[in-house]
């Protein structure tokens, strides 16, 4: 039988999910950060990850649309501002596109998502659908991977700067803002989950939501590894298929 945990025990259980399943443990990230990939493989990472970036504000708008809690909406809408900016040329999506262009990718190709891996699109879509279809508590809990992102972002920026001559500090500027935004967002979401998960079932649902989200991130890296590292099977239509790297 599942027992009711204290809020701090719940937090510990959530952190244990991240320790076991967060995407910092994925071999593709270890290759990426360790300088073991060539430029095309890094380009593949950037253009696939664009799909995730582009979906994040859609899932945040979905969450906002679902709640009648005005305070939650007010706080959550900062995430839309962070990703979309307040005027053209601002925000995380634009900064991600600058990263992709800094790697030599064509901006319109990246935005079109037509060269992304099928599994990337499916994983990203699953996240948006989850936030639309599950309870609000699960929707908020699914964002909690951000508790773990500052560490991986620091590792990524220092590793990529040290190991690739085609990467500059400007290319990676996207991540600077995330180092402030992610802890702020995660602190709020964690507090929300600790206050609103009041039954054993709700607590287990929150843990399962975070597990699901780790799977969303992991699946995207599995797809990259399968296509671009080993066995190197690039799906039809995807970046690099038939030797076309554009
Ligand atoms: O670089 C990363 O490893 C990483 C991880 C995550 C995450 O853990 O979901 C996010 C981000 N970056 C990120 O940049 C971002 O905007 C973001 C939003 C969310 C979310 O679930 O709402 N996760 C993440």
Curated annotation (Swiss-Prot):
InterPro entries: Haem_Oase-like_multi-hlx, PqqC, PqqC-like, Thiaminase-2/PQQC. Pathway: Cofactor biosynthesis; pyrroloquinoline quinone biosynthesis. Gene3D superfamilies: Heme oxygenase-like. GO terms for molecular function: pyrroloquinoline-quinone synthase activity. Keywords: Oxidoreductase, PQQ biosynthesis. It catalyses: 6-(2-amino-2-carboxyethyl)-7,8-dioxo-1,2,3,4,7,8-hexahydroquinoline-2,4-dicarboxylate + 3 O2 = pyrroloquinoline quinone + 2 H2O2 + 2 H2O + H(+). Its EC number is 1.3.3.11. GO terms for biological process: pyrroloquinoline quinone biosynthetic process; sulfur compound metabolic process. It holds the Pfam family TENA_THI-4. Ring cyclization and eight-electron oxidation of 3a-(2-amino-2-carboxyethyl)-4,5-dioxo-4,5,6,7,8,9-hexahydroquinoline-7,9-dicarboxylic-acid to PQQ. Belongs to the PqqC family. This is Pyrroloquinoline-quinone synthase. It comes from Acidiphilium cryptum (strain JF-5). The lineage of its organism: Bacteria, Pseudomonadati, Pseudomonadota, Alphaproteobacteria, Acetobacterales. The gene is pqqC.
């Amino acid at each position: 039988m599942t027992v009711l945990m204290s809020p701090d025990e719940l937090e510990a259980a959530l952190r244990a999910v991240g320790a076991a399943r967060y995407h910092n443990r994925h071999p593709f990230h270890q290759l990426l950060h360790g300088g073991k990939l060539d430029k095309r493989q890094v380009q593949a990472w950037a253009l696939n990850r664009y799909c995730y970036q582009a979906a994040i504000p859609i899932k945040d708008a979905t969450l906002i649309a679902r709640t009648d809690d005005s305070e939650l909406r007010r706080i959550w809408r900062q995430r839309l501002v962070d990703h979309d900016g307040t005027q053209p040329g601002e925000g995380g999506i634009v900064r991600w596109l600058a990263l992709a262009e800094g790697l030599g990718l064509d901006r319109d190709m990246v935005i079109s998502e037509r060269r992304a891996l099928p599994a990337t699109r499916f994983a990203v879509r699953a996240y948006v659908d989850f936030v639309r279809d599950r309870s609000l508590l699960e929707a908020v809990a699914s964002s909690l991977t951000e508790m773990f992102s500052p560490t991986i972002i620091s590792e990524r920026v220092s590793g990529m700067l040290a190991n690739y001559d085609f990467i500059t500090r400007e290319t990676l500027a996207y991540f600077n803002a995330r180092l402030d935004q992610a802890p702020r967002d995660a602190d709020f979401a964690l507090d929300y989950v600790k206050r609103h998960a009041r039954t054993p079932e709700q607590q287990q649902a929150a843990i399962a939501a975070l597990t699901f989200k780790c799977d969303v991130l992991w699946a995207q890296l599995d797809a990259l590894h399968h296509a671009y590292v080993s066995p190197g099977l690039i799906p039809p239509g995807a970046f690099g298929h038939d030797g076309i790297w554009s």
